[in-house]
From Swiss-Prot:
Biological role: Cell division inhibitor that blocks the formation of polar Z ring septums. Rapidly oscillates between the poles of the cell to destabilize FtsZ filaments that have formed before they mature into polar Z rings. Prevents FtsZ polymerization.
Species whose genome carries this gene: Salmonella enteritidis PT4 (strain P125109)
Self-association state and partner proteins as the record states: Interacts with MinD and FtsZ.
Name of this chain's protein: Probable septum site-determining protein MinC
Xref: HAMAP family: MinC (MF_00267)
Region feature (Disordered): 104-125
Similarity field: Belongs to the MinC family.
Length: 235
């Protein structure tokens, strides 16, 4: 048992980000309800981050917040906000303002002359891929942050694979596969036996009934083209 009453630890969570391109509350409500109806088990009462970087017209944040939460989604933060007055409104409602990794600005440090030095011999290599060579069972969730995920065995229904990069499954894929989880729209999904409950790339998803019949159970490659999922044979 720990000697301290609390303990702070770093962790990673995969969240859906709702990018708003329209400030009209009723338009947003209808669009969200349509999305939730497509995948209620996946989106009902889901925690989400609202990205407002695409909004140009004035935003009635209290009304917008009310509309989003009325659909059952739970807002845990707001990203992409550059408007000072909107930041004040968001903060007043107790929501954190988040900075997404790709938007984070870093001020370069002054460059000072330095003598060349040998690279450290014990430096840890950057992880490019997470490899899973055992079956992924129902209820299990595998996450590969900032890298690709390769599974060389079967993935059961009810299991979930999440990667910030690509996902490769060299076995029966019956669960859910979410590639490009941090927003990488170049990510892809590769399956030797595509029978997934859900496939998603950068938040754009298909449920199993949306997978074209000619690719179901076959070797397939999925990627985004013109903001829509596409599938082709895996040769």
């Amino acid at each position: 048992m720990s000697n301290t009453p609390i303990e702070l630890k770093g962790s990673s969570f995969t969240l859906s980000v709702v990018h708003l391109h329209e400030a009209e509350p009723e338009v947003i409500r209808q669009a969200l309800e349509d999305k939730i109806a497509q995948a209620p088990a996946f989106l009902k009462h889901a925690p989400v981050v609202i990205n407002v970087s695409g909004l140009e017209s004035p935003v009635n944040w209290p009304e917008l917040h009310k509309i989003v939460t009325s659909t059952g989604l739970r807002i845990i933060g707001v990203s992409g906000c550059k408007d000072t007055s909107l930041k004040v409104e968001i903060d007043r409602m107790g929501l954190p303002l988040l900075t997404e990794g790709k938007e984070k600005a870093v001020r370069p440090a002054p460059v000072e002359p330095a003598t060349p030095s040998e690279p450290p011999q014990n430096a840890n290599p950057i992880t490019k891929t997470r490899l899973i060579d055992v079956p992924v069972r129902s209820g299990q969730r595998i996450y590969a942050p900032q890298c690709d995920l390769i599974v060389t065995s079967h993935v059961s229904a009810g299991a979930e694979l999440i990667a910030d990069g690509n996902i490769h499954v060299y076995g029966m894929m019956r669960g859910r596969a979410l590639a490009g989880a941090s927003g990488d729209r170049e990510a892809q999904i590769f399956c030797t036996h595509l029978t997934a409950e859900l496939v998603s790339i950068a938040g754009v998803y298909w449920l199993s009934d949306k997978i074209p019949a000619e690719f179901y159970g076959k070797a397939a490659r999925l990627r985004l083209a013109d903001n829509a999922l596409t599938v082709q044979p895996l040769n």
